[in-house]
């Protein structure tokens, strides 16, 4: 069935003749012509109706518009027929080529014959030439537009780059100021720690604390005093005050001139007044008795009243008063008096804020302890309650007095044991503590750690318990050791003068020269059990130590290629500094020894230190690399003052052809 239908379709296709398709095309064309004629007749009819109904003004406007359209069309046709486009405005007499036949069409006959265009008329050649010229002008305009857009984009990019450079410069300036400020703070800290603080160090530290937010500020770890006391303690001569004025200018250039402007101006004015006093210059025509009366007159006035008085004196100085020198000198005294008074008031505000912070912290601690140790209590009679309230008020007054006394020396324990601090920073903070502060901090840490037994005072001990004096016990132990060593009494007496400070002296020797890229090293290795013949005389024990490992970057060719200062390579171990303490060594004439042994990992080795009784051997696991054994390269191996020091650096291998 399917094959028969396909045959019929093929037969029908064959039966169609060209005459049939031509007749269909003719009918379509006839129908389209009829539709076009109908539209044309409709348009003509609408136009005739519009002409019948229009007024004279509308008819005049319509004809004028029609004339303008014809003129524009004729101009366009003339422009197309002309060889030179009108926008060039070139003539035979005025053109950059000095061509007197510029508007005439050049006919290149041979070229036209080769291109097969020899049959073109003069008008056709002119038209093609004009089109080619217009095309070239259009391309030139397009190229100019692209060039201008590229130039504009390039200018925009340069402007954006300048803006980025300007912002980067501002950021770098800000970072530079921050870096300089950090350096100033670091210099201040170092000079204060070393006991050679200058006046600018104390004043800048005071100003930075005064700028902090009272709600978020921490209690300072230094004593707050009136800035004038800092000047008296640090400035002894005219040169000191002159140096202070220059230091203040340098500090304000870094920190900002507008920051604490009044406070720094007051300090500068006081320093200038002290320079005049030190130089023993006369203070105008004011006699000493008159000067005392002037000071008494200033004393009972407020800052606002003194400022008004200063304005009055300035007006008299600018006016035609009789004795300008007198008023000028009086004005100078008034300015110094105002500066001192402002500094005292500012210092009082700082102390009150600090006292309020400490009270708030004390209240929080008391509330926390009460919430943790809250127990149910029985009903108390009203009289007992009143008595207890009076006692509590008295205790609060006493606590306030104690708090005000401890304002200048309370230390935040959290900052000392902050795990985010590196070892040198933590060590610096501990060294900055005074003796009383160190006692308070250690007691607080002992209480926080919940160690056993709990810390109590000597008055709370049970009867029958003997309390030994620490110094006496150390003296007794030192005397017995010297007796066993066979040393002379004179030498033991000389050495017993500071037995307690021996370990601290050793620690100071071990910590000497510690740098920022060094860290404490205590990876001690476990050794086999040791038997000692001298164990019946002295208890064998491991020596104490303070070791350091030095790390840094190895800028070899590979790391220089793949890393930079912003993205540094991993740090590697560059050396070790072993400081092992043997203060109770029986035979001080024999220095401790050390030896290296291999371990399972070939990249590491075991270094073992041997000293003799009463100390056991001690070992550490170190990196297995070749040492630098020259003194100029940092090698040190010595035994002095009971401290065995072994410092060494690893050799650096460099590729050589």
From Swiss-Prot:
Protein name, UniProt field: Splicing factor Cactin
Higher taxonomy: Eukaryota, Metazoa, Ecdysozoa, Nematoda, Chromadorea
Region (Disordered): 1-83, 369-406, 472-503
InterPro entries (alphabetical): Cactin_C, Cactin_central
Biological source species: Caenorhabditis elegans
GO molecular function: RNA binding
Purpose of the protein: Plays a role in pre-mRNA splicing by facilitating excision of a subset of introns. Plays a role during early embryonic development. Required for the distal tip cell migration at the end of larval development and for gonad morphogenesis.
Domain of life (superkingdom): Eukaryota
Cellular component GO terms, alphabetical: cytoplasm; nucleus; spliceosomal complex
């Amino acid at each position: 069935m399917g094959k028969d239908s396909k045959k019929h379709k093929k037969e029908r296709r064959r039966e169609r003749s060209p005459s049939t398709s031509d007749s269909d095309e003719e009918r379509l064309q006839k129908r389209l012509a009829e539709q076009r004629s109908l539209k044309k007749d409709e348009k003509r009819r609408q136009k005739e109706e519009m002409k019948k109904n229009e007024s004279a003004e509308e008819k005049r406007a319509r004809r004028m518009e029609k004339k303008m359209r014809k003129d524009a069309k004729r101009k366009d046709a003339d422009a197309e027929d002309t060889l030179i486009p009108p926008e060039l405005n070139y003539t035979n007499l005025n053109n950059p080529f000095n061509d007197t036949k510029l508007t005439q069409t050049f006919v290149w006959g041979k070229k036209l014959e080769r291109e097969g265009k020899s049959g073109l008329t003069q008008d056709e050649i002119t038209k093609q030439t004009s089109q080619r010229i217009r095309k070239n002008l259009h391309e030139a305009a397009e190229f100019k537009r692209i060039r201008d857009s590229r130039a504009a984009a390039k200018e925009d990019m340069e402007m954006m780059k300048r803006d980025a450079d300007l912002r980067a410069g501002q950021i770098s300036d800000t970072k530079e100021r921050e870096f300089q400020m950090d350096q100033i703070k670091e210099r201040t800290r170092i000079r204060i720690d070393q006991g050679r603080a200058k006046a600018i160090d104390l004043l800048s530290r005071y100003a930075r604390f005064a700028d902090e937010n009272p709600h978020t500020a921490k209690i300072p770890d230094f004593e707050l005093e009136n800035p004038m006391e800092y000047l008296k303690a640090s400035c002894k001569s005219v040169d000191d005050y002159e140096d202070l004025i220059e230091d203040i200018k340098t500090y304000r250039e870094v920190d900002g001139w507008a920051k604490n402007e009044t406070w720094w101006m007051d300090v500068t004015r006081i320093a200038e007044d002290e320079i005049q006093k030190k130089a023993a210059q006369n203070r105008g025509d004011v006699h000493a008795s008159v000067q005392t009366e002037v000071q008494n007159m200033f004393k009972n006035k407020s800052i606002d009243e003194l400022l008004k008085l200063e304005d009055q004196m300035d007006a008299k100085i600018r006016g035609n008063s009789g004795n300008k020198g007198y008023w000028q000198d009086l004005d100078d005294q008034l300015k110094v008096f105002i500066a001192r008074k402002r500094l005292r008031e500012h210092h009082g505000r700082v102390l009150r804020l600090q006292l309020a912070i400490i009270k708030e912290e004390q209240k929080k601690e008391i509330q926390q302890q009460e919430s943790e140790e809250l127990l149910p209590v029985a009903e108390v009679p009203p009289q007992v309650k009143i008595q207890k309230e009076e006692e509590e008020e008295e205790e609060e007054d006493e606590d306030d007095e104690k708090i005000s006394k401890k304002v200048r020396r309370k230390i935040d324990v959290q900052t000392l044991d902050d795990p985010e601090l590196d070892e040198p920073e933590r060590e610096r903070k501990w060294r900055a503590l005074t003796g009383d502060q160190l006692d308070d901090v250690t007691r607080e840490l002992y209480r926080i750690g919940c160690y056993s037994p709990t810390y109590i005072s000597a008055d709370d001990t049970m009867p029958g318990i003997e309390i030994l004096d620490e110094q006496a016990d150390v003296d007794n132990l030192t005397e017995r050791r010297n007796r066993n060593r066979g040393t002379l009494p004179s030498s033991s007496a000389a050495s017993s003068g500071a037995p307690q400070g021996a370990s601290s002296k050793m620690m100071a020797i071990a910590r000497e020269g510690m740098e920022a890229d060094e860290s404490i090293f205590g990876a001690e290795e476990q050794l086999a059990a040791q038997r000692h013949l001298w164990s019946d005389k002295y208890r064998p024990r491991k020596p104490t130590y303070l070791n350091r490992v030095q790390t840094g970057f190895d800028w070899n060719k590979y790391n220089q290629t793949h890393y930079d200062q912003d993205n540094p390579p991993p740090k590697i171990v560059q050396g070790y500094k072993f400081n092992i303490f043997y203060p109770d060594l029986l035979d001080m004439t024999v220095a401790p020894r050390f030896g290296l042994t291999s371990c399972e990992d070939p990249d590491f080795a075991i270094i073992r230190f041997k000293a003799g009784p009463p100390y056991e051997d001690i070992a550490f696991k170190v990196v297995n690399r070749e040492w630098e054994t020259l003194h100029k390269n940092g090698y040190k191996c010595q035994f002095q003052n009971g401290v065995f020091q072994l410092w060494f650096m690893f050799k650096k291998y460099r590729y050589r052809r």
